[in-house]
Amino acid sequence: NVHMYGPHIFNTNNTKIWNYINQFCEFEQYVHRVKVNFKGKIYSFPINLLTLYQLWGCSTPEDARQKITEKQISSSGSNLKDWVVSELGEEIFEIFYKGYSEKQWMRPCEQIPASIGKRLPIRYDYNDAYHDTKYCGIPKDGNYTQIFEKLLDGIEVQLETDFKDLDWKKLAKKLVYCGPIDELFNYKHGPLEYRSLSFKTEIKDTDNFQGVSQMNFTSVDVPWTRIVEHKWFSPKPT
């Protein structure tokens, strides 16, 4: 069984949520790890003490904090570039943020909000687990379909139905809407921009292509953002 959803791993710090979701699916414990390839050099990621050792030879949290302080450039922090260089410096921005973010969002970092860079705070330890959460796992059979099949058991499902044709405000006290939010409100403030992805699947004649489930390619001259090797999502890859 192959986890076919890419590097999207169920994770939470909430014990109540974890216990609830485990009613519908058996999870296998999994720790997601990511590496960065920048112009052929491999770095630990998210940025942690090993990353800073690879960059500058920092071997202690104190050394790393001092070096980061030296690299910081005064800036408004109003966009992704300004925030990263003001917090972490120009070198870290170029290696880990610029190319990857501009490929992903299809616009210059000066036009990307600073909040994008704040999602993965720098770590002054050697923890390289991508998700710094208490619970993290992958469905044992490789897919999430059974969760939704069990969640929907006994619940009316309407297909080929326009949500706007329903008197949806009276359906429930709380409602989860997963469609385009701009369409729901009849494009009152105009259409929103949506980011899309292009997937290319390749089968390689090797039992180990890159040695990790996810490799991010952060150089702007590489036309893709990452390579995912699905075998590493298994607790016992073969």
Where are these regions (language model features)?
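Active-site/ligand-binding neighborhood in enzyme catalytic cores
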Residues: V36-K174, C178-F185
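A short, compositionally biased
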Residues: Q29-H32, Q210
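Short acidic-hydrophobic surface loop/beta-edge motif
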Residues: N1, V34-F38, M215-F217
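Mid-domain catalytic core of redox enzymes
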Residues: T161-T238
